[in-house]
Amino acid sequence: MAEQATKSVLFVCLGNICRSPIAEAVFRKLVTDQNISENWRVDSAATSGYEIGNPPDYRGQSCMKRHGIPMSHVARQITKEDFATFDYILCMDESNLRDLNRKSNQVKTCKAKIELLGSYDPQKQLIIEDPYYGNDSDFETVYQQCVRCCRAFLEKAH
């Protein structure tokens, strides 16, 4: 069997405690279930420094537990190196996209393709809204969007 090149994806949201760790965990489960996890480097990060060092929001952890998806992450902020080392940087909303495009312009070599994760949604829900000020059902909505988008992204990038 031919050796497959490793691809990499970084999921990004504002604080890296709600949406992006859910997307990261969902994508890890997808590539693990398809036995291609060794072909992917997967991580998540924040555009802001608000939550650095914190675990994912407990409501997101509960949601993932209900779906049987392991989730372990410590919030971190995106770095200049991330723009040079990841193939894809997928974010959740227009504000993230603006911040990432601005930050990428400060990097000499940006190899990452920066996109909205929602651009892969077959249901055309472009924005994955921040559930931080919401309730459990808002986290479930984020989870469902991430599942749809990550599946579609994996099919396209695979």
UniProtKB/Swiss-Prot annotation:
Modification sites for Phosphotyrosine: 132-133
InterPro entries: LMW_PTPase, Ptyr_pPase, Ptyr_pPase_sf, Tyr_Pase_low_mol_wt_mml, Tyr_phospatase_low_mol_wt
CDD domains recorded: LMWPTP
Gene Ontology cellular-component annotations: cytoplasm; cytoplasmic side of plasma membrane; cytosol; extracellular exosome; sarcolemma; synapse
Enzyme class: hydrolase
N-acetylalanine modified-residue sites: 2
Pfam families the UniProt entry points to: LMWPc
Effect in UniProt of substituting residue 132 to F: Reduced phosphorylation and activity
Summary of activators and inhibitors of this protein: Inhibited by sulfhydryl reagents.
Cell compartments where the protein resides: Cytoplasm
EC number per UniProt: 3.1.3.48, 3.1.3.2
GO biological process: chemical synaptic transmission
Keywords tagged on the record: Acetylation, Cytoplasm, Hydrolase, Phosphoprotein, Protein phosphatase
An annotated Gene Ontology molecular function: SH3 domain binding
Active site: 13 (nucleophile), 19, 130 (proton donor)
Family indicated by similarity: Belongs to the low molecular weight phosphotyrosine protein phosphatase family.
Purpose of the protein: Acts on tyrosine phosphorylated proteins, low-MW aryl phosphates and natural and synthetic acyl phosphates with differences in substrate specificity between isoform 1 and isoform 2.
PANTHER family tied to this protein: LOW MOLECULAR WEIGHT PHOSPHOTYROSINE PROTEIN PHOSPHATASE, LOW MOLECULAR WEIGHT PROTEIN TYROSINE PHOSPHATASE
Assembly mode: Interacts with EPHA2; dephosphorylates EPHA2. Interacts with EPHB1.
Official protein name in the record: Low molecular weight phosphotyrosine protein phosphatase
